[in-house]
Amino acid sequence: MIAEMFTAENAPFYESASVYSIDKIDREVYAKFIEQQFKAQKKEITADAIDFILDWTRTHTYYTQMLCNRVFQFVKKEAALVDVLVAADTILKEHTDTFLERRNLLTAKQWNYLIAVAKEGVVTEPTSAAFLQKYHLGAPSSVSRLLNSLLEKELLLETKTLEGSSYCVYNVFFSRWLERV
């Protein structure tokens, strides 16, 4: 929505600013940063714990910070993978009511499609026969409407590149929760 203020021809700030794309933080840089933050407070965190954090949060800063903060609160001296798993599970349990509320706003087909995307992580061919058959999602024409509806509701995120579009569940924690459904 904010981007449209600057890129849509009928918007008030059309072409009044430069648009920059910000990539995710490099994984190695991020891992070192996490380790340094723990060390600064006289705590340790194992390499496999950091790897899991970055994988599970898809190196998205908001989710990475939230999980790291929770792990930091839980541990006294050293954070191991088991501590991260407990923290991740706790976060998902805390958000369950919110996630279930979203369920009530969707049709059964929208819900099932969202689960399918979450289980895949990233979908590059959202109407392909293989994807639709794997998750019993129906015909490509009806799935296109589902996809557009979930994009409008901002439950799915579309990422465009020169190679094409890819889709994932917008909220990483919601995606991880849906994987368990």
Regions found by a protein language model. Give the residues of each.
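Conserved AAA+ ATPase "SRH/arginine-finger" region at the nucleotide-binding site
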Residues: 18-29
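Short, conserved catalytic or adaptor-binding loops enriched in Gly and charged residues
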Residues: 10-16
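Sensor-1/coupling segment of RecA-like P-loop NTPase cores
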Residues: 1-10
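Amphipathic alpha-helical "lid/sensor" segments that cap RecA-like P-loop NTPase cores
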Residues: 35-98
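Short, flexible helix/strand-to-coil boundary loops that buttress conserved ligand/catalytic motifs
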Residues: 5-6, 34, 68, 160, ...
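C-terminal leucine-rich, beta-strand-based interaction scaffolds used for sensing/assembly
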Residues: 93, 97-181
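Conserved nucleotide-binding/hydrolysis micro-motifs of P-loop NTPases
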Residues: 1-2, 25-27, 71, 174
